[in-house]
């Protein structure tokens, strides 16, 4: 085969190691198979960072020109490396660095004739299949390539999905055409083809990348670093906050001055009589009784206007208004305000009734008329006044805990700030307003007692005293209900977080076949924490010393047994857990466990208090193990044999002493209660004489 040498004009190097650009020669027709994609072609381009670094190190030296026998009529100076004249758009600058000249020399000069013969042998297999290729891969004729080259000279690069062949008229083209092409054969321009790190591409010029946007390394084609990108969340959140503030600015709060008794809450009884030209009574005791009733009335006015009405009109109604405009929809009004609506109506009726009897007394022309307040007190204190306060107070602790969980939200914080800035709040915050019904209920007996002391009529005193006793009994019942409710809620949450492992998991000594495990599952101990007769006396976090490690444990001391558990926090937090639903009486450690979706796994069977022995450990005995503030708990069976032992370590000496004192007191109380039960069982009624 004839070998030709190509002539290339001298071009000053533009990059490190750049060599003169060769001209295009006509390609023989029998070499069409060489236009197929070849990953091993010398002109391949790699975007691999490692290969780019190798090229960067080798581009500092210039190699002398050397002659290479090319395929067909292709020719290039010796040592000519194939590269792109322009960098890929969006790619690093070093992506067009030179290949190693030694590698090119060894690959191009090894056996050129064998490569040519192999190409000729592949021609009959590749030619007939051109008609079955898709339109993107079918070859084009020379005329279309010539027209494309002319358009390229004019500066218009049109994308083409077809394969690019060297034009046989390449010698007659403008020299800029030579600078745009390389002796590497072809670029596969496939629809949807993207360039990724490590891909090998064969290109005939940098212009191909400019005219084919499918091969651009655009940022849109790459996947983001995080699949669920939070891009734009800040803008949406800012817009939501701005819309919430605009909605709050449209809220209108009505004035409280429309009530008839609004101007009387800050006046004294003498000022009221003087305003209405009413002469005070000559009886000193009757006047003191009237002043006591007036104190009940004015305090109820202040309670209604400055607390209940503020909570209802400013806080609760504003929240309802926001929820109608689709803000704070997940905030539960009942959990936050309970029966505030009922409480407000009851207090308003009580104030209006007292205001009515006072107005009748002041407007009366008779001097000897008296205040008829007994009927009003009987109606409300024996009616719905105490009952409505009880309902509210039972929900108070949960409401405060729910409020603290809502304070962490930005939108709810903006709502609270807007409400508390209202002038009718009188610089009172939400917790101070929510606690007002509890304080009011405990003050009622004091106000009634003051009226009872000032009364002279015996029948009247008996009625007032009975009303006072009724209110005090209601408060005692409320305290019992609060304790019972708190204990019930606490045990309910303990049942959820305390895990009772089966026998075969708790102790590996016992072997239970799968066919028999259903027998033991029927007698699991989930219901052992029944709140009816069992109370939690003390709880806390300690450290259990084992043979090879220290284990964080959590102890529950009940009135009849001790439970040792180990806390296990879930690394994947449960998204559905609502912190507002937790019992407020739980310790911070248990609340943290619940928030993280963790649990408390029982280490051993419950230790009855009559089988429990607690002993203090001197530091001298355990100093070699690095233990401090340690004490020992022994579990004995009915034969006084030790069947389990727990070496526990407290954080401080005071915590250790507190634990030992609590356990000792619980053991003593449990032993006395057991002895009392035995005595009652052995005490039999007297025998009848008729038997």
Curated annotation (Swiss-Prot):
InterPro entries: DBL_dom_sf, DH_dom, PH-like_dom_sf, PH_domain, PKHG5/7
Keyword tags: Glycoprotein
Domain of life per record: Eukaryota
Disordered as annotated region, ranges: 1-48, 109-140
Location of the DH domain: 313-488
MF terms (GO), sorted A to Z: guanyl-nucleotide exchange factor activity
Gene Ontology BP, a term: Rho protein signal transduction
Annotated protein name in UniProt: Pleckstrin homology domain-containing family G member 7
SUPFAM superfamilies linked: DBL homology domain (DH-domain), PH domain-like
PH domain span: 535-668
SMART domains noted in UniProt: PH (SM00233), RhoGEF (SM00325)
Entry-listed glycosylation sites: 395
């Amino acid at each position: 085969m004839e070998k030709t040498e190509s002539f290339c004009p001298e071009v000053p190097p533009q990059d490190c190691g750049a060599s003169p650009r060769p001209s295009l020669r006509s390609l023989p027709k029998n070499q069409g198979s060489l236009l197929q994609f070849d990953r091993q072609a010398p002109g391949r381009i790699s975007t691999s960072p490692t290969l780019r670094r190798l090229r960067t190190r080798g581009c500092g030296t210039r190699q002398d020109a050397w002659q290479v026998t090319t395929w067909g009529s292709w020719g290039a100076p010796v040592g000519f490396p194939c590269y792109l004249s322009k960098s890929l758009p969006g790619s690093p600058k070093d992506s067009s660095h030179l290949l190693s000249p030694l590698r090119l020399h060894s690959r191009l000069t090894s056996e050129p004739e064998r490569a040519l013969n192999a190409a000729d042998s592949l021609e009959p297999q590749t030619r007939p299949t051109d008609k079955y290729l898709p339109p993107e891969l079918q070859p084009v004729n020379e005329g279309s390539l010539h027209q494309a080259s002319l358009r390229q000279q004019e500066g218009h690069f049109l994308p083409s999905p077809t394969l690019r062949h060297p034009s046989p008229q390449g010698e007659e083209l403008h020299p800029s055409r030579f600078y745009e092409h390389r002796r590497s054969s072809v670029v596969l321009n496939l629809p949807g083809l993207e360039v990724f790190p490590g891909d090998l591409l064969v290109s005939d010029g940098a212009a191909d990348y400019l005219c084919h946007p499918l091969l651009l390394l655009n940022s849109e084609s790459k996947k983001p670093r995080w699949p669920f990108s939070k891009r734009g969340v800040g803008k949406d959140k800012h817009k939501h906050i701005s819309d919430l503030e605009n909605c709050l600015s449209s809220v209108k709060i009505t004035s409280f001055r429309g009530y008839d008794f609004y101007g009387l809450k800050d006046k004294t009884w003498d000022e009221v009589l003087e305003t209405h030209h009413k002469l005070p009574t000559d009886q000193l005791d009757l006047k003191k009784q009237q002043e006591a009733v007036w104190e009940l009335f004015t305090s109820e006015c202040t309670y209604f206007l400055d607390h209940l009405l503020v909570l209802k009109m400013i806080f609760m109604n504003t929240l309802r208004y926001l929820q109608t405009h689709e803000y704070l929809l997940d905030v539960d009004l009942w959990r936050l305000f309970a029966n505030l609506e009922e409480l407000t109506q009851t207090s308003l009726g009580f104030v209006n009734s007292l205001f009515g009897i006072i107005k009748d007394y002041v407007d009366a022309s008779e001097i000897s008329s008296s205040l008829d307040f007994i009927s009003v007190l009987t109606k409300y204190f024996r009616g719905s006044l105490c009952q409505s306060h009880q309902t509210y107070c039972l929900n108070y602790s949960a409401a405060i805990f729910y409020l603290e969980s809502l304070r962490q939200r930005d939108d709810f914080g903006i709502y609270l700030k807007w409400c508390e800035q209202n002038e009718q709040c009188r610089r009172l915050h939400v917790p101070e307003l929510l606690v007002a019904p509890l304080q009011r209920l405990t003050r009622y007996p004091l106000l009634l007692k003051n009226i009872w002391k000032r009364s002279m009529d015996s029948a009247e005193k008996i009625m007032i005293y009975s009303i006072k006793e009724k209110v005090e009994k209601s408060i005692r019942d409320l305290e019992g209900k609060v304790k019972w409710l708190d204990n019930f809620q606490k045990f309910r949450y303990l049942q959820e977080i305390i895990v009772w492992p089966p026998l075969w998991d708790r102790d590996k000594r016992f072997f239970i076949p799968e066919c028999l495990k259903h027998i033991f599952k029927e007698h699991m101990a989930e219901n052992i924490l029944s709140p009816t007769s069992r109370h939690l006396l003390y709880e806390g976090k300690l450290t259990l010393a084992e043979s090879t490690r220290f284990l964080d444990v959590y102890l529950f001391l009940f009135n009849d047994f001790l439970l040792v558990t180990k806390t296990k926090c879930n690394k994947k937090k449960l998204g559905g857990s609502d912190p507002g639903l937790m019992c407020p009486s739980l310790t911070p450690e248990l609340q943290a466990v619940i928030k993280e979706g963790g649990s408390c796994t029982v280490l051993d069977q419950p230790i009855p208090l009559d089988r429990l022995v607690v002993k203090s450990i001197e530091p001298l005995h355990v100093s070699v193990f690095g233990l401090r503030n340690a004490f020992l708990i022994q579990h004995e069976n009915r034969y006084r044999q030790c069947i389990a032992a727990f070496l526990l370590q407290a954080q401080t000496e005071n915590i250790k002493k507190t634990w030992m004192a609590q356990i000792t007191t619980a053991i003593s109380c449990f032993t006395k209660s057991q002895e009392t039960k035995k005595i009652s069982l052995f005490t039999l009624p007297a025998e009848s004489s008729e038997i």
